[in-house]
């Protein structure tokens, strides 16, 4: 009998906790913020065809966005 009461209590407690989570707006893990000092995206570095060779080299060195294009 005690086991049944304990299981019912735990089940009701779990349901209450789930309801509080949904009501509080919690839907999953909190996303990680972008690193400090770096922009979240680099549209200039992503447009490789518009960059000069020196700008492409700077993007490669600073941000790791390397443009491997043959300039003609």
Curated annotation (Swiss-Prot):
Disulfide bonds join 45-59, 48-66, 60-67. Higher expression in hemocytes and to a lesser extent in heart, testis, gills, intestine, lymphoid organ and hepatopancreas. Traces in eyes and subcuticular epithelium. Not present in the brain. InterPro entries: Penaeidin. Residues 1-21 form the signal peptide. GO terms for molecular function: chitin binding. The modification Lysine amide is found at residue 71. It comes from the Eukaryota. It holds the Pfam family Penaeidin. Keywords: Amidation, Antibiotic, Antimicrobial, Chitin-binding, Disulfide bond, Fungicide, Signal. One of its GO terms (biological process) is defense response to bacterium. It is found in: Cytoplasmic granule. GO terms for cellular component: cytoplasm. Antibacterial activity against M.luteus and E.coli bacteria. Antifungal activity against N.crassa and F.oxysporum. Presents chitin-binding activity. Belongs to the penaeidin family. This is Penaeidin-2a. It comes from Penaeus vannamei.
């Amino acid at each position: 009998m005690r086991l049944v009461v304990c299981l019912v209590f735990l089940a009701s407690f779990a349901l209450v906790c789930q309801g509080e989570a949904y009501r509080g707006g919690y839907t999953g893990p909190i996303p990680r913020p972008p690193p400090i000092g770096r922009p979240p995206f680099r549209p200039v570095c992503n447009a490789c065809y518009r960059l000069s060779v020196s700008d492409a080299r700077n993007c490669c060195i600073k941000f790791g966005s390397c443009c491997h294009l043959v300039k003609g």
